[in-house]
Structures are given as structure tokens and as C-alpha cells.
Amino acid sequence: MKALRAAAAVVRKPSLLITTLVRPPEPGSLAHKAFTKGARANVWIYRRTGGKVGGKLDGTPLLLLHHVGRKSGVARVMPLVYLPDGDNVVVVASMGGAPKSPAWFHNLTSTPDTLVEIGRERRSVRARIAEPDEKAALWPRLVEQYPPFAAYQQRTERDIPVLVLEPR
């Protein structure tokens, strides 16, 4: 049944096939640098249009997550797929199924109080890792909304973290 739902999603959104099959670029590689520049361009466009352009990935909503480098202290912004969950917002530290969690995840575990932008709205939030039972309830909804998450989890040995961003 899961495979059938994933196949149906790919038929509706062919670009999901690429995001499901292609591994994330290695940090420091030319492809990674291009991805980083693309993310910065997406942030710029998102902000200028209030998320009307650059606010969705294959029909899935994106937010802009602010975080501060735990080593560098540099403020950064990352566009991420998110799932609304009542007053909370849920994000996934998948990094395309890479062996390591993304830097923004480690940054949020060091400095959990942060800001997200959803459209033109800015929200102060506190990040926390979802409890196992909470993740078990959220994961099917996340995969339904963005099917590549299932492939990302199969691609890696690590348990992909799910973060709940709660209003402050």
C-alpha cells in the first residue's frame, strides 16, 4: 500500500521521482555549492513575494527557518518543507537521506529559540525533537504530504529526526 501511494504521488508530481532517487550532494562539492546558492536564491524570491513564488516544493509548502551556526555564530536561513500541526510547525531533518543530519538541525539543538517565516508572517518558535510516540504519529502525515521522506529514511541508517517548532 505504501509503495502504491508513493507511485501515485510520483505520477501526480513527476519531479518527486528526481528528489526520491537522487542522493544529496557531498558537502564542499560543486553540486553542494550550487544547491546552497539555489537555496539562497529561493529565500530571496520567497521574501520578495511573501512565499507566492518559491513557497512550495512540488506543491508542498515551504517555510524559512532561521538558525545560528553553533560553531561560527553566523545567522542563516534555510527553506524547508513543513507540516502545520495545530499551533505547531513540524520539520524533518532528512538532508535527502544523507548519512548525517543537516547543519541546521545541530544548530537548533544548540540554540532552540528561533524564528520561522511562513508567507509574510514571522513566528518566534522553540524547536524540540519529537518524542518517539509523537514522531510515530507525525511520520505518516509527513510522508503523505511529501513522499520522498520515506525514500530518504530507507536510504540512510540514521533515524531521521523530526522537529516540532512550538510558539514562544
What are these regions (language model features)?
Residues K2-P61:
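Alpha-helical membrane-targeting segments
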